[in-house]
Amino acid sequence: MVGVEVYPKNRLVSANAEQQISVTAIYSDGHTEDATHIATYEANDKEIAEVDDTGHVKFFEQPGDVSVMVRYLGQVGVYQASVPLGAPVNVTPQPRNFIDELVFAKLKRVGMPPSAVSDDATFIRRVSIDIAGRLPTEAEAKTFLESTDPAKRDKLIDTLLASTDYADYFANKWGALLRNKRSSNTAMRGNYAFHGWIRDSLHKNVRYDEFARSVLAASGDMGQNPAATWYREVKTMQTQMEDTAQLFLGTRMQCAQCHHHPFEKWSQKDYYSFSAFFSTVGRKPGRNPGEEVIYHTRKVAQTANKKDGCLLYTS
């Protein structure tokens, strides 16, 4: 068997509605079989809906999104549904970008009115805290509130993003995400160098893909190439891959180590093939006590699936 097909895949349903899910098993020779009554089901939010052993879903009055995971012979499918709040959404703010368009479309679909556009005083306070990690100065607030420039909000955002306050604030955030912590006194040189590298990258507005590549492909001494400090805290292929997926791709892969990811398309094969990318990472003692030199060996990137021992490669 190569997969399962769940029908319907997603629906907008009313409160207290019911839905029967059907499950079809798909085999490599092209034939299919009904697996509805032998698959297993699990809802991820039992306050919104519950599902029985036959795939019959019962919704409650709680609005929101719910997913029902369907498992059969190691394959996974998902049914997704939304119970709308039900309020009329006739007017939305003017979209400023494609993210606004997607958000407003979702709000209309689930009947959730958007918040009103904030006033100028609220905006400058919020955006200063969010971007620079501080309240606006008296001079900044006075200049902004007195301005009649229709583009003043965009200009304020650009000014804050170009400031050292932004670089300082987000360097702390990224430092935590990249596990830049002092595990010992001998780690201090790498810690300070890595923090400075992150801060400078943000202040120079280094492209996101370039920033990620510099971390993942880092090699050498941690004092000379601070980005290599990341490898000091994430030592195994699995940890390196899981951190990479979550930090840079916004995807949690942990579940796929043992089985198909319950609410995503990722399989065990994907998990170990991705992990294989880091199989070429090596380390050796550095010149200073407690430090390491990171290097990448010249070999085929591969690892074995722990379940069946099959070798998998990074494609």
Model-predicted segments: where are they?
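Extracytoplasmic soluble-region selector
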Residues: M1-F104, R109
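Short, structured secondary-structure elements
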Residues: E61-V68, S82-G86, N90-L311
